[in-house]
Amino acid sequence: MFSLALAFGITACAGTAGQSGDGKPAESGASAQEKNAQYEGQLQDKQAMLENMFNGFLSAVRNGSDAETLYGFLTDTSEYWLDTLENHAKVYNSEALDTCQFYEAYTIILYRLYEREHLWETDEDRMLFMMLSKSGMLDRFTNLPLGPMKVKNDRGSIGLAKSPEVPIMIFEWDDQNWKLNLPETVPLITKGIESIAVKKNWNGKKLALYWIEKEYHMTYSRLDESLLEPIGF
Protein backbone atom coordinates (compact mmCIF):
# COMPACT_ATOMS: atom_id res chain seq x y z
CA MET A 1 0.00 0.00 0.00
CA PHE A 2 2.93 2.34 0.70
CA SER A 3 4.18 1.92 -2.86
CA LEU A 4 0.71 2.69 -4.21
CA ALA A 5 0.41 5.82 -2.07
CA LEU A 6 3.82 6.91 -3.27
CA ALA A 7 2.80 6.33 -6.89
CA PHE A 8 -0.35 8.44 -6.45
CA GLY A 9 1.72 11.16 -4.75
CA ILE A 10 4.16 11.36 -7.66
CA THR A 11 1.27 11.61 -10.12
CA ALA A 12 -0.29 14.50 -8.20
CA CYS A 13 3.00 16.39 -8.03
CA ALA A 14 3.55 15.92 -11.75
CA GLY A 15 0.09 17.32 -12.45
CA THR A 16 0.63 20.50 -10.43
CA ALA A 17 3.96 21.19 -12.12
CA GLY A 18 2.22 21.67 -15.46
CA GLN A 19 1.68 19.38 -18.42
CA SER A 20 3.76 19.07 -21.52
CA GLY A 21 2.15 18.24 -24.79
CA ASP A 22 3.60 14.76 -24.93
CA GLY A 23 0.91 13.20 -22.69
CA LYS A 24 3.31 11.85 -20.04
CA PRO A 25 1.11 12.79 -17.06
CA ALA A 26 -1.73 10.79 -18.59
CA GLU A 27 0.61 7.80 -18.97
CA SER A 28 1.70 8.15 -15.34
CA GLY A 29 -1.94 8.21 -14.20
CA ALA A 30 -2.74 5.15 -16.28
CA SER A 31 0.24 3.35 -14.79
CA ALA A 32 -1.01 4.03 -11.26
CA GLN A 33 -4.45 2.74 -12.19
CA GLU A 34 -2.91 -0.38 -13.70
CA LYS A 35 -0.90 -0.99 -10.55
CA ASN A 36 -3.99 -0.55 -8.42
CA ALA A 37 -5.93 -2.99 -10.60
CA GLN A 38 -3.06 -5.46 -10.43
CA TYR A 39 -2.95 -5.18 -6.64
CA GLU A 40 -6.71 -5.74 -6.38
CA GLY A 41 -6.41 -8.74 -8.68
CA GLN A 42 -3.67 -10.23 -6.51
CA LEU A 43 -5.85 -9.79 -3.44
CA GLN A 44 -8.73 -11.56 -5.14
CA ASP A 45 -6.42 -14.40 -6.20
CA LYS A 46 -5.12 -14.76 -2.64
CA GLN A 47 -8.66 -14.70 -1.30
CA ALA A 48 -9.67 -17.53 -3.63
CA MET A 49 -6.54 -19.51 -2.75
CA LEU A 50 -7.19 -19.07 0.96
CA GLU A 51 -10.75 -20.31 0.58
CA ASN A 52 -9.54 -23.33 -1.39
CA MET A 53 -6.82 -24.05 1.15
CA PHE A 54 -9.28 -23.85 4.04
CA ASN A 55 -11.74 -26.19 2.34
CA GLY A 56 -8.91 -28.63 1.66
CA PHE A 57 -7.79 -28.38 5.27
CA LEU A 58 -11.28 -29.12 6.59
CA SER A 59 -11.60 -32.07 4.22
CA ALA A 60 -8.22 -33.46 5.34
CA VAL A 61 -9.18 -33.19 9.02
CA ARG A 62 -12.59 -34.77 8.60
CA ASN A 63 -11.34 -37.57 6.36
CA GLY A 64 -8.61 -38.59 8.81
CA SER A 65 -5.65 -37.69 6.59
CA ASP A 66 -2.13 -38.75 7.55
CA ALA A 67 0.36 -36.56 9.40
CA GLU A 68 2.30 -35.55 6.29
CA THR A 69 -0.87 -34.21 4.68
CA LEU A 70 -1.90 -32.30 7.80
CA TYR A 71 1.56 -30.81 8.31
CA GLY A 72 1.34 -29.54 4.72
CA PHE A 73 -1.38 -27.12 5.83
CA LEU A 74 0.69 -25.70 8.73
CA THR A 75 3.46 -23.14 9.03
CA ASP A 76 6.92 -24.32 10.06
CA THR A 77 6.49 -22.51 13.37
CA SER A 78 3.31 -24.52 13.97
CA GLU A 79 5.15 -27.82 13.60
CA TYR A 80 7.89 -26.67 15.98
CA TRP A 81 5.25 -25.45 18.46
CA LEU A 82 3.46 -28.81 18.43
CA ASP A 83 6.74 -30.66 19.03
CA THR A 84 7.59 -28.32 21.91
CA LEU A 85 4.17 -28.74 23.55
CA GLU A 86 4.37 -32.52 23.24
CA ASN A 87 7.75 -32.50 24.96
CA HIS A 88 6.37 -30.26 27.74
CA ALA A 89 3.46 -32.67 28.22
CA LYS A 90 5.96 -35.43 28.92
CA VAL A 91 8.19 -33.57 31.38
CA TYR A 92 6.50 -30.51 32.92
CA ASN A 93 5.53 -30.85 36.57
CA SER A 94 2.93 -28.77 38.37
CA GLU A 95 5.38 -25.98 39.14
CA ALA A 96 6.49 -25.74 35.51
CA LEU A 97 2.86 -25.56 34.39
CA ASP A 98 2.54 -22.36 36.42
CA THR A 99 4.65 -20.68 33.72
CA CYS A 100 2.21 -21.67 30.95
CA GLN A 101 -0.56 -19.65 29.39
CA PHE A 102 -4.04 -21.17 29.70
CA TYR A 103 -4.11 -22.60 26.17
CA GLU A 104 -0.69 -24.23 26.71
CA ALA A 105 -1.63 -25.73 30.08
CA TYR A 106 -4.97 -26.94 28.70
CA THR A 107 -3.27 -28.64 25.76
CA ILE A 108 -0.69 -30.32 28.00
CA ILE A 109 -3.28 -31.59 30.49
CA LEU A 110 -5.55 -32.84 27.71
CA TYR A 111 -2.58 -34.68 26.18
CA ARG A 112 -1.99 -36.41 29.51
CA LEU A 113 -5.65 -37.36 29.73
CA TYR A 114 -5.39 -38.97 26.29
CA GLU A 115 -2.30 -40.84 27.47
CA ARG A 116 -3.83 -42.07 30.72
CA GLU A 117 -7.08 -43.18 29.11
CA HIS A 118 -5.32 -44.81 26.12
CA LEU A 119 -7.18 -42.67 23.61
CA TRP A 120 -4.40 -42.50 21.04
CA GLU A 121 -4.95 -43.94 17.59
CA THR A 122 -1.35 -43.36 16.53
CA ASP A 123 2.13 -43.84 17.97
CA GLU A 124 3.56 -40.71 16.34
CA ASP A 125 2.59 -37.08 15.89
CA ARG A 126 0.17 -37.37 18.77
CA MET A 127 -0.09 -33.67 19.54
CA LEU A 128 -0.86 -33.00 15.89
CA PHE A 129 -3.71 -35.50 15.86
CA MET A 130 -5.07 -34.30 19.20
CA MET A 131 -5.32 -30.82 17.71
CA LEU A 132 -6.43 -31.63 14.18
CA SER A 133 -8.15 -35.00 14.19
CA LYS A 134 -11.88 -35.29 13.65
CA SER A 135 -13.52 -34.13 16.90
CA GLY A 136 -10.18 -32.61 17.91
CA MET A 137 -9.71 -29.13 19.37
CA LEU A 138 -9.97 -27.22 16.07
CA ASP A 139 -12.64 -29.40 14.51
CA ARG A 140 -15.09 -28.39 17.22
CA PHE A 141 -14.72 -24.74 16.29
CA THR A 142 -14.70 -25.18 12.52
CA ASN A 143 -18.07 -26.94 12.80
CA LEU A 144 -19.56 -23.66 14.04
CA PRO A 145 -21.02 -21.17 11.51
CA LEU A 146 -18.07 -19.19 10.17
CA GLY A 147 -17.87 -15.76 8.58
CA PRO A 148 -16.10 -14.78 5.35
CA MET A 149 -12.37 -15.10 4.81
CA LYS A 150 -10.39 -11.88 5.09
CA VAL A 151 -7.03 -11.16 3.47
CA LYS A 152 -4.67 -8.28 4.20
CA ASN A 153 -1.34 -8.49 2.42
CA ASP A 154 0.26 -11.77 3.54
CA ARG A 155 -2.13 -12.44 6.42
CA GLY A 156 -5.47 -14.17 6.27
CA SER A 157 -8.12 -14.77 8.91
CA ILE A 158 -11.61 -16.07 9.55
CA GLY A 159 -14.04 -15.42 12.40
CA LEU A 160 -17.36 -16.76 13.54
CA ALA A 161 -20.44 -15.76 11.55
CA LYS A 162 -21.87 -13.90 14.54
CA SER A 163 -18.70 -11.80 14.92
CA PRO A 164 -16.83 -11.98 11.59
CA GLU A 165 -14.51 -9.08 12.43
CA VAL A 166 -13.04 -11.02 15.38
CA PRO A 167 -10.61 -13.61 13.99
CA ILE A 168 -10.36 -17.10 15.47
CA MET A 169 -7.95 -18.55 12.91
CA ILE A 170 -4.83 -16.96 11.42
CA PHE A 171 -3.17 -17.88 8.12
CA GLU A 172 0.15 -16.82 6.60
CA TRP A 173 1.19 -16.56 2.96
CA ASP A 174 4.49 -18.31 2.24
CA ASP A 175 5.07 -17.05 -1.35
CA GLN A 176 3.08 -19.87 -2.96
CA ASN A 177 0.49 -21.17 -0.52
CA TRP A 178 -1.52 -20.28 2.56
CA LYS A 179 -0.61 -22.01 5.83
CA LEU A 180 -2.42 -22.16 9.15
CA ASN A 181 -0.54 -20.56 12.06
CA LEU A 182 -1.46 -22.66 15.09
CA PRO A 183 0.50 -20.71 17.76
CA GLU A 184 -1.54 -17.62 16.85
CA THR A 185 -4.83 -19.46 16.25
CA VAL A 186 -5.18 -21.50 19.45
CA PRO A 187 -4.98 -18.47 21.82
CA LEU A 188 -7.76 -16.81 19.79
CA ILE A 189 -9.97 -19.89 20.07
CA THR A 190 -9.54 -20.09 23.84
CA LYS A 191 -9.67 -16.34 24.53
CA GLY A 192 -13.29 -16.37 25.68
CA ILE A 193 -12.60 -19.07 28.26
CA GLU A 194 -9.72 -17.09 29.75
CA SER A 195 -12.13 -14.44 31.02
CA ILE A 196 -13.09 -16.95 33.74
CA ALA A 197 -9.54 -16.86 35.10
CA VAL A 198 -9.66 -13.08 35.33
CA LYS A 199 -12.93 -13.14 37.27
CA LYS A 200 -11.74 -15.85 39.66
CA ASN A 201 -8.13 -14.65 39.87
CA TRP A 202 -6.82 -18.03 38.68
CA ASN A 203 -3.65 -18.76 36.76
CA GLY A 204 -3.68 -20.65 33.46
CA LYS A 205 -2.99 -24.02 35.06
CA LYS A 206 -5.91 -23.85 37.47
CA LEU A 207 -8.31 -22.71 34.77
CA ALA A 208 -7.09 -25.48 32.44
CA LEU A 209 -7.74 -28.18 35.03
CA TYR A 210 -11.15 -26.67 35.80
CA TRP A 211 -12.09 -26.63 32.12
CA ILE A 212 -10.92 -30.21 31.53
CA GLU A 213 -13.08 -31.34 34.46
CA LYS A 214 -16.03 -29.35 33.12
CA GLU A 215 -15.74 -30.91 29.67
CA TYR A 216 -15.00 -34.52 30.57
CA HIS A 217 -16.42 -35.22 34.04
CA MET A 218 -19.23 -37.34 32.58
CA THR A 219 -16.75 -39.53 30.71
CA TYR A 220 -13.59 -39.91 32.79
CA SER A 221 -12.70 -40.05 36.48
CA ARG A 222 -9.73 -38.56 38.36
CA LEU A 223 -9.80 -35.25 36.54
CA ASP A 224 -7.71 -33.80 39.32
CA GLU A 225 -4.23 -32.57 40.17
CA SER A 226 -2.72 -35.93 39.21
CA LEU A 227 -2.87 -34.61 35.62
CA LEU A 228 -0.52 -31.79 36.58
CA GLU A 229 2.38 -34.24 36.80
CA PRO A 230 3.97 -36.39 34.07
CA ILE A 231 2.28 -39.79 34.01
CA GLY A 232 4.76 -42.46 33.02
CA PHE A 233 5.75 -41.47 29.50
Task: Give the ranges of each region predicted by the language model.
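Short, low-complexity N-terminal intrinsically disordered segments enriched in polar/charged residues
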Residues: G18-D66, G72, D76-D83, N201, ...
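Short solvent-exposed beta->alpha transition segments
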Residues: N36-A37, Q44, E51, A67-L146
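Flexible domain-boundary/linker segments
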Residues: S59, L74, N87-H88, L160, ...
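C-terminal motif of bacterial Sec signal peptides marking the signal peptidase cleavage site
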Residues: G9-A12
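Low-complexity, intrinsically disordered terminal/linker segments enriched in charged
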Residues: S135, F141-D175, K179-F233
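Short, conserved catalytic or interaction motifs in soluble domains
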Residues: G15
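Sec-dependent signal peptide recognition
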Residues: M1-S3
